[in-house]
């Protein structure tokens, strides 16, 4: 069960006022589509096999060559940033190459995070599985076999076992250094770096210490504040990955009503706003999704229900799924929404779970729907979610197809630009 179903930290609604204590040094505002539609994606990209082998050794506690790992990681980031620029992506990142996943990487940075062994004697609650997959156990079995993984079947599962604090900046500094060097070499239009939201960690790093979800979320927010501010101070746009505002409804909180879930979402937004209180909104974006897997998705909470809560988050940009068959229609639902003038929409216009390569004209049509709602300058073309969310999962989209999709995204943005600036 969740905690007290109340915001642990007061919510704030963004206004265009620079907060006191704002990080000035190194900060950049998110680029707008002032004279053409800009392109980006969500973060994770296919990791090179040799890097995967080193990552697996590190995660499982086996001996590995740390110098070889650092050297290969730096080279891989150089390569992947250059590939993004060559594909026509404007706002690039490090592909999350040095992270095991977008959430559990925190065990290398936060104190109080221990591990337990996953498996038959320590299974997670049924709510760890998506509700739509529980409706279709035959498909769930097929999906797990295809991924070569089942829920919590990895050897090492992180959990909160003590007071949470940011204790080791070295992995963060390595990521910042590698992305800085890669961007210096190829000079992209913009670069961003991912970080987990406080709320999403309550699912992927289960609490065994605080025994109160509100207290745990607040502790995570206080700890992650250091990472968030460091990313922005280094000159990158901060992307906070917050599927706790979407997919958590049909897994972690599937036993609750929509109204109860939205109160939890409000609490998580309040924690996120607290953690980013020293960062200008225009230096941040937030990613919302409903689970990066091909499946029925019949229990996804509609965007229309969670959108107003998302608008109360401080980050100026909102990245969200808008290409897959369960959410591609939802642009219609935003036409009647009050969207603050300074919010930037980053709809997914390519699907991250299928090997179909979208036609550039379809991508342009999707971009046009959102440009009609908020204006062309406030739309950036993105992807639904990451292409390599978990390092050791057999991700559905083949690496060569990932790059074909990103090239199609760039071409679709050019087609949309020709239409919108004609």
Model-derived regions: residue spans:
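Short, Lys/Arg-enriched N-terminal segments with co-localized hydrophobic residues
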Residues: 11-29
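Domain-level signal for soluble alpha/beta catalytic cores
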Residues: 23-422
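Basic polycationic patches enriched in arginine
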Residues: 4-6, 15-16
């Amino acid at each position: 069960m969740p905690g007290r179903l109340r915001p642990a930290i007061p919510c704030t609604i963004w206004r265009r006022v620079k907060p006191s204590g704002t990080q000035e040094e190194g900060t950049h505002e998110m680029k707008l589509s002032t004279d053409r539609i800009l392109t980006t994606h969500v973060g994770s990209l296919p990791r090179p096999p040799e890097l995967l082998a080193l990552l697996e050794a590190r995660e499982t506690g086996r001996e590995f060559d740390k110098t070889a790992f650092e050297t290969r990681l730096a080279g891989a980031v150089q390569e992947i940033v250059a590939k993004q620029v060559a594909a026509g992506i404007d706002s690039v990142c490090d592909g999350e190459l040095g992270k095991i996943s977008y959430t559990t990487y925190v065990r290398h940075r936060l104190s109080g995070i221990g591990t337990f062994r996953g498996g038959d004697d320590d299974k997670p609650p049924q709510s760890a599985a998506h509700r739509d997959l529980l409706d279709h156990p035959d498909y769930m079995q097929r999906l797990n076999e295809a991924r070569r993984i089942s829920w919590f079947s990895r050897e090492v599962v992180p959990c909160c076992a003590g007071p949470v604090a940011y204790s080791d900046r070295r992995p963060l500094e390595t990521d910042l250094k590698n992305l800085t060097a890669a961007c210096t070499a190829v000079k992209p239009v913009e670069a961003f770096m991912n970080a987990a939201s406080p709320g999403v960690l309550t699912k992927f790093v289960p609490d065994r210490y605080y025994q109160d979800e509100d207290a745990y979320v607040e502790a995570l927010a206080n700890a992650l504040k250091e990472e968030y501010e460091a990313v922005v101070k280094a000159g990158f746009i901060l992307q906070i990955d917050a599927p706790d505002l979407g997919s958590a409804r049909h897994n972690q909180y599937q036993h609750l009503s929509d109204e109860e879930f939205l109160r939890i979402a409000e609490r998580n937004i309040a924690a996120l706003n607290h953690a980013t209180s020293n960062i200008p909104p225009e230096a941040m974006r937030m990613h919302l999704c409903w689970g990066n897997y091909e499946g029925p998705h019949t229990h996804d909470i509609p965007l229309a229900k969670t959108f107003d809560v998302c608008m109360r988050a401080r980050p100026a940009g909102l990245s969200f799924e808008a290409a897959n068959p369960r959410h591609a229609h939802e642009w219609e639902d935003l036409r009647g929404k009050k969207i603050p003038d300074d919010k930037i929409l980053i709809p997914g216009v390519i699907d991250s779970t299928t090997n179909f390569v979208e036609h550039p004209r379809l991508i342009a049509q999707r971009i046009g729907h959102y440009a009609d709602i908020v204006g062309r300058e406030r739309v950036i073309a993105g992807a639904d979610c990451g292409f390599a969310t978990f390092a050791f999962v057999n991700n559905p989209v083949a690496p060569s197809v990932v790059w074909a999709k990103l090239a199609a995204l760039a071409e679709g943005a050019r087609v949309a630009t020709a239409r919108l600036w004609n």
